[in-house]
Each structure stands twice: as structure tokens, then as C-alpha cells.
Amino acid sequence: MNTLFNGKLAAMVLALSMVNISAAYAQDENANAKEEGNRNVMLNAASANGPREIQIGLPSADVNVLENGLPVTYATNPHSVNTIWRGDASLSHQGLLKIAETAITTGNIGYAVNSFTQKGQKGFNGTLNYKSNHFGLQEFSLNMNGDLGKDWFYSVNMYQDFDPGTFKIKSTPYQDRTQIYKALLTKKYNNERGEFTAMYKYANSHNVYNYATQSAPFIYVGDGSVKEYGKFKLGTTSYLPIDNEMTYRDMRTGKLAQTTLYDACLNKASEVTLMNSYRFDNGLNWKATLKYDHSRGAMVYQTPMAIVDLNSADNHGLYNYMYRDIDGQTKAYNGQYVQTRMSCLNAGTIDEALFTTELNKKFKTSTLRLGLNEWFYHIDYCSNTTMYDQSVPADGSYAVRVWDANLRSGYFYDFNKNASEYYKGSENKLALYFTHDWDVTKKLNLYYGARVEWQRLKGENAAVKNAQGNFVGRFAYYHLGAMAADGTKIAPVDLAYNWLNYDFSVAATYKLTDNFGFTGDFTYIVQHPKFEAFAPATLPNTDKISVPLGRAGIYYNNSWLSLTSLFSYISKTNNNSTLNLQHGSEIKAAPLAYDIQTWGWTTDAVAHPFKGFDFHFLFTYQKPTYKKFETSVTFNDGYVGKINATGNIVAEIPEILIELDPSYMVTKDIKLWTSFRYFSKTYANINEAYYFNGHWETFGGVNWQASKRLSLGCTVVNFLNQTGAKGSIAGAELITKDEAKNIKNQIMTGSYLRPFTVEFTASLKF
């Protein structure tokens, strides 16, 4: 999990919702009735291969993606969504579930991508999708389905991704090498009232992009802008060292081992899904889905920490950095800067069994639904961490690993000292939920629902206490069986928890006239920490996590305009996090639990002013602030690093967001479209010391239905060719506003905007 604060508050939107609220909560067979519109969920400025993360003014959490009504993965660390799911030809439907629907059916807060696998249809049907870009991406997706006679149907799918990324790295030709296979067999029975489907899926993925694109150097000017560091091009120059080998100390055994970064990020999944639906004579509909998955999940991070200026007067004579040249000869490093990085090798063996069943029935003026979840998750997980140093080349060449000969004779050091993790055991959630969508009168629609959930954790972790009852924390060469300086032996610690969680949601829409009305909704969720929260060296705050979300406003619809404007409030208590605070070359972990609250106002409009032209506009103002955000840590030299961010704007979340999405049908077969997203100023550290100016994310393209069976497309990502940094700045958590005033034109590292990219797509139906 490695809850590095600078990677977890990924930022975007308070409440990107609100279109066609009057139809928001119908619970019929049409999946769109439970979904949002106009979200462009697959237009992702952060990634070329996954769904866009739509935030709601809270810290980033698990991305909710459902396939056939079940989560694609129970927990996204260490098994990320993109390694086992893609928006490819294997899917018959993709949408975005509303916040209330996600809360009631899954117990999570936020939007969820809702997808369904393509089942067999009568006759023979095929879809072949192809995608490429000017960097060399080759992506293929194939679905073939048909009938076998006597109400038997089949569907087979293949997905292949060969993505070199936007810059070349030495360790592998691909930053994403993913293959996914699916096979389905369906039987309709009892005069097609019932349908049973068995599906097998296998996925194999190396998500190199997760660490290859994690950071890059730039010059922070001091006014919210950045400029390039020498010839280093943000987004098109690699910042990874040439060497692909990694030495680590196994958290479980204590033995030194070697791997490659490519092998360390191998993800594999083998899963079986059974689906059944049945329509009874009395109008009652029943569906049930069961999935078992056995997998290896892995996430690799190469997190930047301190940058040392060797030319600084304060550092003169302190360091003696060396490197090995292409012939293996040891030579003195004469560059100006050295970057310290923390390598985190996260991996776990996972077994999960997820079962969901629902009954629903339509009445004259309402629809009633009753559902049950039984979700079981077992994992054996650890994160092995290693520190190393590398060069920071200004000429755009590949970085090399270096070591300080005054301290050590090799590249790697401080094994498992920082952010190493371990937990093993199971998490089980048993939940019962219901929803009722009721047209009380012709003018008033009422939707309400509730969920009651029993959450049980049982297993072990490495949050070890000494004889005085204090957590030992991590130290160099930490592992199970190691001995701390005070004589405490590191041994697994048993843990067991039982919690009652609950959610409820209510929404009302009142039509004052045929075109104008009022709308509002309120969702309240009570959760407790997930198993992954027990991975660090200390126990998390196990108090309840409460998330209230309320919205109220107006809507107006006519023949050419649909407009909604709402005020929103959302908050969340007891966010568990671990800050890896840095002082000089030392890193200390500081766990804390804090609250967040966000007020906001959103206006969303969809207009069709003339034939062929559509325009979507969204404006959001929000003010997300920290509450109860205080922590401190004492470093080895006696320095006490303190943070009090209470009242500060949440890092990485903008206060103003704008979306502009015009499109025009040039002919009945050719569509031109663009999408503009504006993100205002964001703070790049917790203390509001560093910040990045606002920026636009832009997309544009043309779609051509060349024939009945062939469609072609061209998309340009970042067509304004904006370059720059975003997110947070590595190692900057303790920097204050007063200190930052004097920091100008200084080299730093962080994440960056996706570079200008031209993509080509083709889809053939046969």
C-alpha cells in the first residue's frame, strides 16, 4: 500500500454528477437509469489504458470498477484494475454508476465504472478493435460470439496491449504488456425466462508504467510555474536508471534476494464467474453472480525522495559518489545532483470469492429491490523496500545508479527501513440492502435505500510493540524474525475485528412545472478500515469512518437545453494515512488520522442549439479543507518535524473546475468533437508552501462511420501541447510557507502532464 501522502491525494472533482436528475434513480432493467451521463469516463489525461478517476472532493481511494455487478478486484493494492480489466470489445456496456447506487450496492463512496461482458447472441457476431498512437502503441481487442443451437450460446474474447509508453526505457520495450482472455458459455432455459452463464477469464500484465511514469525532474520557478531542467523533456524523457536489477531483503524470511523491476510487477489472475437470472410469472426478477479469483497482484513504486546538490557549499566534502561505467569500471560521479529513491516492491497472493444476488419487482408506480453481498477476500501480502541513489542528468540521457563510497560499497541500502509492509489473512463482508424508487405523484419522485454490512477481519501483521507498549517501527534490515535495537523480536501480531457498517440514501425530485423543478439527495456512509490499512508499522485508527454527502438545487429542461445547478457538502472522518517525512537524508514514517470537509457548487448543462451540434458545460467551485490534521516526528539528530494543516486546502485538489465538451455531426457519418478540462491552482504540499498554476487538459478528434461495419477515429490528447508538473512535490511535506518564499528556480521532482499524443482507432463488425 505504501501510503505515501504525495501519491494519495490525487485530485479532481467535488461532485461531477448532476445531469438529468429527474431520471436519476429509476431502478429498472436499463443500466443507464442508475448511471451518470456526460462523464467521458474513458477520456483519461493521466493514463492511456484505464478509466478516468472522477473524484468527489475527498482523498483518492480505490477506483470502483464493476463487471457483471461485482468488483473487478476487491482491493486495488496490490492488484490494480488495469491489470485485469480494460474497456475493450469484450464488454457489451460501460457506464458510470451514481454515488447513491455505488454506496448502497457496494458500501463505497464515489462513482463506479459499471460494465457488462458481451454474451453470445443469435447467429455469428464479431468485433475487432484496434488502437495505435504515434509513440508506437499497438492494442488489439477481439470478440466473437454466436449460438450453438438449442438455446446454447458462446462468446470468446482476446485483448492484447503492446504499449512502449511516451519514452523509451532500457529495462523493457513495453511500459504496458497486458493480455486478457475470456470465454463464456450461456444456456437459456424455461422458454427463455432463465439464463445461466459460466465465464472463465485469464489475465497476465506487467504494469511498468506505474513506476516508469511516477516522477521526473523540473525547475520550480517559485510562482507556481515550472520550466525544463536542461534537456529533460517532461513526459517524453525517461527518469529511470538504466539498471533493471533490484536487490531487496524479503520481509518474510529476511534473506537477500534479487529480481528485475519487470518481473516484480507481474500480475496474473485466473477467475471463474457464474451468472444466473430468472423472470418469474408474478413479475419478480432474480439474478445472482458468483466469482472466484486466484491471482498474484503486484505494484512497483520508484518513489523520489531527497535531491542532493553536490555543488552546494553545505555539502562540500560530505559525499563521495561513484558509479560503474558500461565496462563495469568504478568511476567518480561528477554530476551536480543526486536523487534518492525508495523502491517499493508490493506483491501478494490473493484468493477472493464474491457473491451478489438481487430480487426486484416493478409495481405500477414504483420499483423495489432487495440485494445481498457475500464478499470474501484472502491475501498474503508484503512490501519490500530498498533505498538507492541515482544521477540526475541534465542532458536528457539515461540516469545511472550511484553510491556514496564514504558510507557503502554498493547501490542498495536501508532494506525495509521505510514503508515496508506485511499483512496476511482474510476480510469478509456480508451485507443486505434495499432500494425503493417511487413516483409518489406525477410531480414528486422519491428514491431511498439502505445497506447493513457486517465486516470481519482476521489475520496478522507486523505492527510490533516493545515491552513499554510502544510501536517499534521499521528499521534497517527489518523483517519477520529480526531483532530491534531494544531487544524486541519482530514477530507477526494477530489481529481480529468485527464491525457493523451501514449506509442510507434518500433523493427527491419535485416537478414544479413540466420544465422546472427542485432536486436533492443525501447519502450517509459508515465504514471501518479495510485490511490494507493494517499494513504499516503501527495500527490504524479503527474508529468508524463517516461520510455524509448532501446536494440540493434546481433543474430545467426543454427541447434543446438540460440544466442542473446544485450546492453540495461532503466530509469524511478518520482518513488513515502515513506521511513519509524527510529531513536531510533521513526519512521517518508518521501515521495519522484526519478529517476532510468540502463545500461546493456545481452547474451542469447539456445544450442542442441547432441540428448536429451538442455542447456540454460543467462548472464546479469547491473548497476542500483539512480538519484535525496534526502530526510530528523526531529525527535522529533531534530535529522535530511538525505539521499542522488544519484549515488548509487539501493538497492536489483544485478549487475551480470547468469542463467544455462541444461536438458536431458534419454529416450523418462524421463527428467532430473536443473536450476541455480546466483545473485551477493546486497546492503541491500539505503546508500550502508549493503550488502549481491552473492548467487545461484537452482532447479532440474525429469519428467516421466509414461503412455499416467499419468505424475509424483519430484522437489528439493534449492538443494544446501543455507541458508542466502536477500533483505533489517529492520530499516537500515539511516545507513551510515562509521557507518556500525564498525557494526559487530550484530543481525538484514530481508527476507531470500527459504529453501531446495522436491516437488512431478502428473498429470492424463482422
Task: Set out the residue ranges of the language-model regions.
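Acidic/polar loop-and-plug regions of large Gram-negative outer-membrane beta-barrel proteins
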Residues: P173, T186, E195-T273, A298-C344, ...
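Gram-negative outer-membrane beta-barrel transporters
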Residues: K442, W560-S562, L566-T578, A589-I686, ...
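Outer-membrane beta-barrel transmembrane strands
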Residues: R252-Y301, V338-S383, N416-Y447, V493-K511, ...
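Acidic, small-polar-rich N-terminal luminal/periplasmic segments of exported/outer-membrane proteins
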Residues: V19, Q27-G123
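C-terminal beta-signal and adjacent terminal beta-strands/loops
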Residues: Q27, S680-Y683, V702-F766
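Structural signature of Gram-negative outer-membrane beta-barrels, strongest in the C-terminal barrel
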Residues: I350, T367-Y377, C382-T386, Q390-T573, ...
